[in-house]
Every structure is written in C-alpha cells, then in structure tokens.
Amino acid sequence: IWLLTAYTVSSFLLLKESEESSVWSTIQIYMKQIDSKFIAMDQCVEGIAGNQDLIGQICYGSPADRYYAAVELQKSMKRDVISNTELDYVLIAESLNKNLIAASTPGVSYGEKEAIASYIWNLMEKEDRGRPQWYYTKIGTHAYIAKIYRGSNWSVAAFSKENTFLSDIRAKEYPDGQSFLLTDANGVCVENLEEGNSMYLGETLEIEDSWKNDHKKRMISLKSDRAGLYITGMIGSNHFLGKFSTNSILILLIMVLAIGCDMILLHYIHREIH
C-alpha cells in the first residue's frame, strides 16, 4: 500500500515537472521567434538610418530634390523588405510636419499606411512624457508588431503582421487548457496566443514564476532582452488532473485490490492461528 501511495505521488510530481518542462521549452521557442523578428527590424532600421541625407532632402529640399530622394529611398526600403522575409513592410514618417515620406508596403492599403503614420506620431508625443523608445502593439484593422527608430525629425517603423507573427506555434496545439500570453514590460497583455480566448487582452497581469489562485494555476514567464516582451505560459490544475485522472483511477483500483488481498490474507492467518 505504501509503495502504491508513493508511486501515485511520484507519478503526479513527475507529470507536473514534465508539463512545466514542456511549457518552458515552448516559451523558449516563442522567444526565438520574437528575437528573430526584432533582429530583422533592427537590421532594416540600421540600413535606412544610413540614408539620412535622402530623408533630409525629402523633408527640407526643393520639390525636385524631394522627388528624387523619395524615389531613391523607396528603392532602398523595398530592397530591405524583399531581402528580409521576417518583415511585412517598413514606413518612414516626418514627425515635424506629420508627413508620410515613404513606405515599402506590399499588399498594404494607403489607409493602413496613414493609420500607421498616425500611430508613429502619437508614439512620439507619448515619448515626450517619458515613454520608452521602442514600441510594439496592435493598431488599425490588422494587428502589427512594430519597432520604431527616431531621428531628429523623422521616424522609421519596421512592422510584422500578427498573422505571420508566432503563427506556426500557438496554444491551439494544447487543447486541454494551456494558454500563452504575450505582454509588454508593464505586464499589459498585447496578444493572447490561445486562439479564440480574449479574456486577458489589454489587462494588466501580475506575471511571476509562482503558484497562483490557491495552487490552481501555474504561470511561467520569460523575457526577451531584445524585444522587451514577456512570454508567459499558464498551466491550470485541470491540465494536470485531466491527464492524470485515468492513471489515478487505475492506481486507486490496484490499491483497493491490494488492501482486499491483505485483509483476506490476514483473515486466513488469523484463522490458522486459532
């Protein structure tokens, strides 16, 4: 009986450790994808930042200079996007006069470009109030992950559409309740990676590696140093117990049979003694 009890407890602990290890591995895969996106954005922004002369001509040059510089800058941006499959498009806006300078945006409408440019200007206004330089969020009719670089009077934004962001690994592969959240440095959820569940979107979450809600929910979080984003995997108690229930019933039956056999054996020994 004691051996069976020990086996039951150890099996549960091993299952829990296995699930946590699985979640941790999945979080690390998410993080590699995030880092890959932001590395691509960095490379693209660095390339465009080397064209400040062209941007200056667009902002302050003659009409002819502006046209020439815009064409050359667009060529450079298009090369950056085409050569980098991680990015959907890149956009440059002049923050001083709030003009959209150029956009390498295959398959993106003019209205979306304008919405993104407006978003950049709003971010610059927020930065004056002490906000950080790098941003990532959802905007417009489609969701985007954005990384933005600002010169003195211009801004570059490299974007990745949500439907290509973390699309190949989602929590739908964990149908028994596991969920993954993407949060910013303030703990605000910017994407729920469990398909069809939006209960956490936009909410501020306490993310820490500890037991929550009377040991009913485990939250494991990992931060990307490059992107400043947190990936958090959550495991509910049902996630453990659902897989464990079949084994538990089987072990319980074995324990009952073992106890019954012991009782019969003790009864037989008692009769033999007397």
Where are these regions (language model features)?
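Extreme N-terminal signal-anchor transmembrane helix of membrane signaling/transducer proteins, especially
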Residues: I1-E17, S21, V256, G260
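Conserved beta-strands of PAS-like sensory domains
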Residues: A102-S104, S109-I120, K138-E173, E191, ...
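Membrane-proximal, non-catalytic sensory/regulatory domains of signal-transducing membrane proteins
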Residues: W121-R150, Q178-L181, N186-G187, G196-T232
